[in-house]
Swiss-Prot record:
Thermal dependence of function as given in the entry: Thermostable between 20-43 degrees Celsius.
Gene Ontology cellular-component annotations: cytoplasm; cytosol
Active site: H112 (proton acceptor)
Organism, scientific name: Danio rerio (Zebrafish)
Name of the featured protein: Sulfotransferase 6B1
Gene Ontology MF terms in the entry: sulfotransferase activity
Record SUPFAM superfamilies: P-loop containing nucleoside triphosphate hydrolases
Role this protein plays: Sulfotransferase that utilizes 3'-phospho-5'-adenylyl sulfate (PAPS) as sulfonate donor to catalyze the sulfate conjugation of a variety of xenobiotic and endogenous compounds, including dopamine, T3 (triiodo-L-thyronine), T4 (thyroxine), flavonoids, isoflavonoids, and other phenolic compounds.
UniProt gene name: sult6b1
InterPro entries referenced in this protein's UniProt entry, alphabetically: P-loop_NTPase, Sulfotransferase_dom
Keywords in alphabetical order: Cytoplasm, Transferase
Length: 296
């Protein structure tokens, strides 16, 4: 994690107000996603055999990176050590983006970006795209703790302030609901598969099987079972020191469903319910999300 470590050390010396900047109305990390990095993304050439992983922040991205790497290794018979940097394209400096062209397939590329801000070839080249969503109440709680543990991002002043910013979309990578509505438009695209964090927590073996089939990476039942066993959240936390070094505790906290109940006031819960229903009621994504089960 040496590159990430040096970036975090740079950020630790910065004032909180300098850690984010606004681009086209959306906040991004000054250290991880400077303008030249996002500018260069316009030239990134996806391939049809790329594996693309997308998630709004704190919806299970790092968990699914680990699962996908295990699926790739098991299916291809390789045992590759994961690279030191997370596969988020918006974190890759321009020189690294250019080196990506030389990477052998299958390449695992990830992003927290809104679909409108992704490299155009993510859609024109028709690679398979896995999108992970999580209920908004647990997402905002996880995001709040992440802000307070990650030196690259400014500290959240308070839970109430961060909740308010999340509700208006004034957080890094933009509005959760804007992301959700953008993927709702693509929910029937055969190259897009949307999975729910809560469903994966409920039945990880089934999730591993569906994901491997979607990416045409066949696994035996034994491999599915083994990958699921190694990828429970508790196993990931245990292994996080090895996989993420000192940053393991930043990326993996509780991973629970329902932790929002320890943070939300009754008024905040009602406010989120109203916003959720005004934005997503009647959508196909809402039908998958099972909001009433996980957020009441």
């Amino acid at each position: 994690m040496s590159q990430m470590k040096s970036r975090m050390e740079t950020a630790a010396k910065m004032k909180d107000e300098d850690k984010l900047y606004r681009r086209d109305g959306i906040l991004y990390s000054t250290v991880l996603s400077p303008p030249e990095t996002l500018d260069k993304l316009k030239d990134l050439q996806a391939r049809e055999d790329d594996l693309i992983l997308v998630a709004y922040p704190k919806c299970g991205f790092n968990w699914m990176v680990a699962v996908l790497r295990k699926i790739i290794n098991a299916s291809t018979g390789k045992d590759e050590k994961p690279p030191e940097r997370p596969p988020l394209v918006e974190f890759l400096p321009p020189t690294v983006q250019e080196e990506m062209a030389q990477m052998p397939p299958p390449r695992l590329l990830g992003t927290h970006l809104h679909p409108d801000n992704m490299p155009a070839t993510f859609f024109t080249k028709k690679p398979k795209i896995l999108v992970v969503f999580r209920n908004p109440k647990d997402t905002v709680v996880s995001y709040y703790h992440f802000m307070n543990k990650n030196p690259v991002l400014p500290n959240a002043e308070s839970w109430d302030k961060f909740f308010s910013d999340f509700m208006t979309g004034d957080v890094s990578w933009g509005s959760y609901f804007d992301h959700a509505l953008a993927w709702e438009k693509r929910i029937d695209d055969p190259n897009v598969m949307i999975v729910m964090y809560e469903d994966l927590k409920q039945n990880l073996p089934e999730g591993v099987k569906k994901i491997s089939e979607f990416f045409s990476l066949p696994l035996t039942d034994e491999q599915v079972s083994s990958i699921a066993g190694q990828s429970t959240f508790s196993a990931m936390v245990e292994n996080s020191q090895k996989s993420h070094g000192n940053f393991g505790s930043i990326f993996f906290r509780k991973g629970e469903v329902g932790d929002w109940k320890n943070h939300f006031s009754e008024a905040q819960s009602k406010q989120m319910d109203e916003l959720y229903h005004s934005k997503l009621a009647g959508t196909k994504l809402a039908a998958r999300m099972n909001y009433d089960l996980y957020c009441q």
